From Swiss-Prot:
The gene coding for this protein is located in the pseudoautosomal region 1 (PAR1) of X and Y chromosomes. This is E3 SUMO-protein ligase ZBED1. SUPFAM superfamilies: beta-beta-alpha zinc fingers, Hermes dimerisation domain, Ribonuclease H-like. It is found in: Nucleus, PML body; Nucleus. It comes from Homo sapiens (Human). Functions as an E3-type small ubiquitin-like modifier (SUMO) ligase which sumoylates CHD3/Mi2-alpha, causing its release from DNA. This results in suppression of CHD3/Mi2-alpha transcription repression, increased recruitment of RNA polymerase II to gene promoters and positive regulation of transcription including H1-5 and ribosomal proteins such as: RPS6, RPL10A, and RPL12. The resulting increased transcriptional activity drives cell proliferation. Binds to 5'-TGTCG[CT]GA[CT]A-3' consensus sequences in gene promoters of ribosomal proteins. Residues 652-694 are annotated as: Required for the formation of higher order complexes of ZBED1 with consensus DNA binding sequences. Zn(2+) binds at C47, C50, H66, H71. GO terms for cellular component: centrosome; chromatin; nuclear membrane; nucleoplasm; nucleus; PML body.
Amino acid sequence: MENKSLESSQTDLKLVAHPRAKSKVWKYFGFDTNAEGCILQWKKIYCRICMAQIAYSGNTSNLSYHLEKNHPEEFCEFVKSNTEQMREAFATAFSKLKPESSQQPGQDALAVKAGHGYDSKKQQELTAAVLGLICEGLYPASIVDEPTFKVLLKTADPRYELPSRKYISTKAIPEKYGAVREVILKELAEATWCGISTDMWRSENQNRAYVTLAAHFLGLGAPNCLSMGSRCLKTFEVPEENTAETITRVLYEVFIEWGISAKVFGATTNYGKDIVKACSLLDVAVHMPCLGHTFNAGIQQAFQLPKLGALLSRCRKLVEYFQQSAVAMYMLYEKQKQQNVAHCMLVSNRVSWWGSTLAMLQRLKEQQFVIAGVLVEDSNNHHLMLEASEWATIEGLVELLQPFKQVAEMLSASRYPTISMVKPLLHMLLNTTLNIKETDSKELSMAKEVIAKELSKTYQETPEIDMFLNVATFLDPRYKRLPFLSAFERQQVENRVVEEAKGLLDKVKDGGYRPAEDKIFPVPEEPPVKKLMRTSTPPPASVINNMLAEIFCQTGGVEDQEEWHAQVVEELSNFKSQKVLGLNEDPLKWWSDRLALFPLLPKVLQKYWCVTATRVAPERLFGSAANVVSAKRNRLAPAHVDEQVFLYENARSGAEAEPEDQDEGEWGLDQEQVFSLGDGVSGGFFGIRDSSFL
């Protein structure tokens, strides 16, 4: 009797799919609801076929697994229904494949039976496409064992034989790694100077910490055309103990392996003590703090001020209430309709990133009156209402953080080296956004003071970094006037440029410096005046003339140094007299068009602009592409992290931007979701089980 009543209660369940479901697997599963249609429990799901209860944690991997193990017929139906969805996910991988010429049915069967024509060519093309998907999409090699992936390829071409995971891991990926490595070795051999950057990240799935090392250089991508190059060199695991020693050893080995020991001029890092110590031990001249990391450090310090911290905590509780209460969510929607406000949910934030906090505060400010209307009618939650002074502080924080968001967006959209923009941006922020006004509240004034102190301490109170950034800015024809410096400071910058140019000329003369690019914009081997004298004078006709020439035409004395100095000063003066370039114009194109006019200054430019402003590409640091990359890296097996991240990063160099996730980025600047449901194709189809890493 008890079993019958249980069965009867289960069959009486009113199941509904997830309200934001995307995967077609929800056809077979649902949540239990009450009489009003509200979901009773979000962490329990029922199978519509066998009424089994399944735990739900935010993704659909266990749902498809339940179908595969218990309901094979429905699983096949589910796989077939998703074929088109899978086709779209892999469209890029197959876009380069040429359509096979049409054949008669008899001829087709004969070709399959004989094994020619198709196997040799088409098999290679499809295997190359699969390898491209794995490498450029950061998929683990175990994807070739996924049933749905096999179904996709069989649907695309039933004759194709998919290689094994072992072949992909031990042969195909290493061969592609070797080919790409040879190309990058040639690029670095031709580079005059290079900067490095270190991206420290953690794989949450494996609880391992990694460092991805990249090299950056300013070279000649085409004849008479300067271009910025960025190449990933290595990804290595760092232990919890002896981190600095490990990083130092690996960096040294990488410098030797890639032949850049004498070319590394600067390093851009998050300014962690371990990486800074490693760079110091390796005598890296410039330690450049990551601009994005510095922004976050200063803003997070401001958020930790007692009153601001308490306010942000109240804001998070308010958002959490609306996200977790179906009644409150419904009332919010109704109030938005009544007040003719666009329907949108409140935004939660991640405590560690300021961009998501800004998104939360902006949405609260937009919905201020709607929220107040809901809470007035909810007597049990009046304590969540914010006071007028708190709303004023929220408005002030939004106004304070908005320029930082605009700076982040500008850096992300920039197609040029960003190191020359650091000083102008800092000057703008320190003298406008962070300038304390009389109308500012005490909390807002303290926040501005804390952020300004962090920016100044990091960039302006270190003389070497300050001078480096000033020179990098001066060499940008958009900012060369340096209006934020005094006349004395500008003269110091110009003197540094002259010293750098003369130093490069001295290396040329000593034979210790001969970059490959000299064939494009050559540095003269001697002062122009003496070269003219030598070429215009006929060769000596006697031994006496040779002796006289040795006495009166010898080079390398004080006279030469003066002529070198005069040439550099003249070139610098010519550069200063050129028209200032527009802010939206390309500084690299400006220099490329004038390589013949300026034979020396581009050499200094290559040395200073190879150092980057951020430790990773700005569009990844500030944008939502960060989530895509992080999620993909997390699923890689430890043994393949180095090769696959290497191939992924170098495949994307100069390619289109990483497609953005729907969730917030590393900085939360693009966050529009209420919370991540993990309910998509990536969760249902490509959720890699733990056994995939074995």
